[in-house]
Amino acid sequence: MAKGQSLQDPFLNALRRERVPVSIYLVNGIKLQGQIESFDQFVILLKNTVSQMVYKHAISTVVPSRPVSHHSNNTGGGSNNYHHGSSPAPSSQPQQDSADAE
């Protein structure tokens, strides 16, 4: 599996498995809506009233209608390369470089 697919595949698979409605925005600005029926390295099959084959190179953004957990299959305590969405809380006071203080 290519490194670029290590986030893509679990995310898309969770959307497919849980039948989450998605909005897919294409690079030309068109918005498609439906459920991910299946996907491979190059395309996503999007099902609404009809099934559409959407080439991944034409996709700008995939927006789920609700949050999904795409890393739940990682039961080990070890770290992985997935970004879990948590980041350190910002400091309550702005920090200033000593060179900037006057």
UniProtKB/Swiss-Prot annotation:
Domain (Sm): residue spans on this chain: 9-68
Keywords recorded for this protein, A-Z: RNA-binding, Stress response
CDD domains found in the cross-reference section: Hfq
Amino acid composition bias (Low complexity), ranges on this chain: 70-102
GO biological process: regulation of DNA-templated transcription; regulation of RNA stability; regulation of translation, ncRNA-mediated
Gene3D superfamilies: 2.30.30.100
Molecular functions (GO terms): RNA binding
UniProt GO cellular component terms: cytosol
Region (Disordered): 63-102
Pfam families xrefs: Hfq
Keyword RNA-binding: yes
SUPFAM superfamilies for the chain: Sm-like ribonucleoproteins
Record's function text: RNA chaperone that binds small regulatory RNA (sRNAs) and mRNAs to facilitate mRNA translational regulation in response to envelope stress, environmental stress and changes in metabolite concentrations. Also binds with high specificity to tRNAs.
Family assignment from sequence similarity: Belongs to the Hfq family.
Subunit relationships: Homohexamer.
HAMAP family: Hfq
Protein name: RNA-binding protein Hfq
Lineage, broadest ranks: Bacteria, Pseudomonadati, Pseudomonadota, Gammaproteobacteria, Enterobacterales
Gene that encodes it: hfq
